[in-house]
């Protein structure tokens, strides 16, 4: 699911592959910027055909699932689907940022910048993090879609 995360800024598809490494702490340095390298490990490289990012009840503020606070979760009821894990996380980040703006009435930066998304694009070449290059197609309701 898309949610804020203490070490990586947000958790999404890129971060989910951390379960395939024996030493997850090795990937938590520098705001989790090495996460994209996991996608090049033989165990997982080229095996993901479709990325699904749940945005059913996103967490938009806080340290992540271990510090859950119901005030910062909302019923978005969305599902993002993409062949590109970087693009899907970019759009998940945009959703979180839009909700934070709506809730706080101003831009409030995440405690940890989600730099792993751009690094996954620029360094590890996993996809695109530039929202201008992402085709975002919305199906269904548009009320309160935020992005």
Predicted regions located by residue number:
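Extended, low-polarity segments enriched in aliphatic/aromatic residues
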Residues: 1-147
């Amino acid at each position: 699911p898309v949610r804020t995360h203490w070490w990586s800024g947000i958790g999404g598809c890129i971060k989910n592959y951390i379960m395939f490494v024996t030493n997850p702490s090795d990937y938590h340095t520098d705001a989790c910027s090495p996460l994209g390298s996991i996608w090049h490990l033989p165990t997982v490289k080229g095996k993901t055909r479709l990325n699904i990012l749940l945005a059913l009840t996103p967490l938009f503020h806080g340290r992540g699932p271990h510090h859950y606070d119901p005030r910062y979760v909302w019923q978005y009821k969305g599902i993002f689907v993409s062949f590109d894990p970087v693009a899907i996380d970019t759009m998940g980040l945009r959703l979180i940022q839009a909700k934070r703006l709506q809730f706080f009435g101003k831009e409030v930066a995440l405690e940890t910048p989600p730099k792993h998304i751009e690094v996954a694009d620029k360094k590890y070449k996993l996809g695109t993090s530039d929202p201008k290059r992402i085709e975002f197609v919305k199906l269904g309701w548009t009320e309160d879609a935020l992005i």
